[in-house]
Curated annotation (Swiss-Prot):
Transmembrane segments: none annotated. Pfam families: Mur_ligase_M. It comes from Chelativorans sp. (strain BNC1). Its EC number is 6.3.2.9. Cell wall formation. Catalyzes the addition of glutamate to the nucleotide precursor UDP-N-acetylmuramoyl-L-alanine (UMA). Belongs to the MurCDEF family. The gene is murD. InterPro entries: Folylpolyglutamate_synth_CS, Mur-like_cat_sf, Mur_ligase_C_dom_sf, Mur_ligase_cen, MurD. This is UDP-N-acetylmuramoylalanine--D-glutamate ligase.
Length: 467
């Protein structure tokens, strides 16, 4: 735990006791501050009480004595309208921050030069965060990873000079972190998302920009118009910017040509290394993740050789193109995190011949946008409520069956793929659907796929179960 010593002797209101809320309250208390915590969910309040946290309805609090409101990232700050606790704090002139800002202040107080990599983007930030942390650890660096992935930030070990921190930051967390100042800030991409919470694309992009605007080195993917504009603004302001791109060569920055990564500068481009043969980084989208992680690790002082070694041992993230096992020439891949068609596209574009398990609770638009990948699909195995609609979309473009369940789909796909004379093929769970018709969440769905694969006679499992 990181004691929040910067709030010693101060009274803090905290709203939001799910997720990181309890850890944040405990950090305030450990640092000598006083917390009054609340949540609209009575069960969360009861859990906090059981942890020894003082609770009370913030509507009844004396806001004249409160120094700060700590807000959970899931609580609306502005859109669609401010939460009532936000309105109370603003009326009283009380600052409103989140747990990432709490960490930033502790780092500034106790180890201002402890390397901090903060990563955001609409897509790819979890993989980039995990990859960056893995490479740093593999190179022998004392490394802590958390934020919007894994551990709540205040449960990490306290800042010391040589301890590296790698934090995934959502737009909600950035919005509550006014003084975020990473050693390396990474902005991967900006596409429409969370507009119900941020109002407009311009506001959403402006929030994302804050992370890199405060960075010593701003690492920015420039393959979309919003990020290009951010990079241009920061460069004009004299900030250090490392551009990354998948769509073409750069005069200064990092780019990819297929699986080969390059670093460009001073009028020349030099190869860094290749991603060829690294199964956990397969696919064009992972080339961007790898470029960003490489740039961040270089900013932290690693050599290209150390980065390449770390890449080659990266196990990947669970449920994101996760290689589960192999049976002869058939690879089994769990991409359960793909809960809509856009999220399935990277996996479908990464393999030449696919036995595709898809379906679940359908999203608007179905799989019509994936038609360009149908020639890659040897056969589709459709599950859940979406099966009839997906069958209608596929039509005669490729073979399909309505399997109903993941267990049946894995058995049938394994049988059919084993008989495929084409050579290496993949059985891919990439549902393009939510999971809630058959499973509690996409993680449970992914576990069901893993279990079905493990049950196949002769299967050679790949790696260990990852969180």
């Amino acid at each position: 735990m990181i004691p929040a010593t910067t709030f010693h002797g101060r009274q803090v209101a905290l709203f939001g006791l799910g997720g990181s809320g309890i850890a944040t309250a405990q950090a305030i208390m450990a640092g000598g501050g006083e917390v009054l915590a609340w949540d609209d969910n009575p069960e969360s309040v009861a859990k906090a009480k059981a942890e020894g946290i003082k609770t009370g309805d913030l509507r009844d609090a004396d806001w004249r004595s409160i120094h700060t409101l700590l807000l959970a990232p899931g609580v609306p700050l502005t859109h669609p309208h401010p939460h009532w606790s936000v309105e109370l704090a603003r009326s009283a002139g009380v600052e409103i921050i989140g747990d990432i800002e709490l960490f930033v202040r502790e780092r500034r107080m106790h180890a201002a030069h402890a390397p901090l990599v903060a990563i955001t983007g609409t897509n790819g930030k979890s993989t980039t965060t995990a990859l960056t942390a893995h490479v740093l650890k593999a190179a022998g660096r004392d490394t802590q990873m958390g934020g919007n992935i894994g551990r709540a930030v205040m449960t990490l070990d306290p800042p010391v000079a040589d301890r590296h921190y790698v934090l995934e930051c959502s737009s909600y967390q950035i919005d509550l972190s006014p003084t975020l100042n990473p050693t390396a800030g990474v902005l991967l991409n900006i596409t429409p998302d969370h507009l119900d919470r941020h109002g407009t694309m311009e506001n959403y992009a402006a929030i994302k920009e804050r992370l890199v605007a405060g960075s010593d080195t701003a690492i920015i993917g420039v393959d979309d118009e919003y990020c290009r504009a951010v990079a241009d603004r920061l460069e004009k302001a004299g900030r250090k910017v490392s551009r990354i791109s998948l769509t073409g060569t750069l005069e200064d920055g990092f780019f990819a040509d297929g699986t080969q990564l390059f670093r460009a500068g001073q009028g020349k481009a030099e190869p860094l290394f290749s991603l060829e043969g690294i199964g956990s980084l397969r696919g064009r989208h992972n080339a961007q993740n790898a470029l960003a992680a490489a740039a961040a690790c270089l900013a932290c002082g690693l050599s290209p050789a150390e980065i390449q070694t770390g890449f080659r041992s990266f196990p990947g993230l669970a449920h994101r193109m996760e290689q589960v096992g192999k049976l002869g020439h058939v690879l089994f891949v769990n991409d359960s995190k793909a809960t809509n068609a856009d999220a399935s596209a990277p996996a479908l574009s990464s393999f030449p011949r696919i036995y595709w398990i898809a379906g679940g609770l359908p999203k608007a638009g179905g799989i019509a946008s994936l038609r360009q990948y149908f020639p890659r699909i040897a056969k589709a195995y459709l599950i859940g409520e979406a099966a009839p609609a997906f069958a209608a979309t596929i039509g005669e473009a490729t073979n399909y069956e309505i399997s109903g369940t993941i267990a049946a789909a894995v058995q049938h796909a394994a049988r059919d793929a084993a008989d495929d004379p084409a050579g290496d093929v993949v059985v891919l769970l990439s549902p393009a659907c939510a999971s809630f018709d058959q499973f509690r969440n996409f993680e449970v769905r992914g576990e069901a796929f893993r279990d079905a694969v493990r049950a196949l006679p002769g299967i050679e499992l790949i790696g260990e179960k990852r969180a």
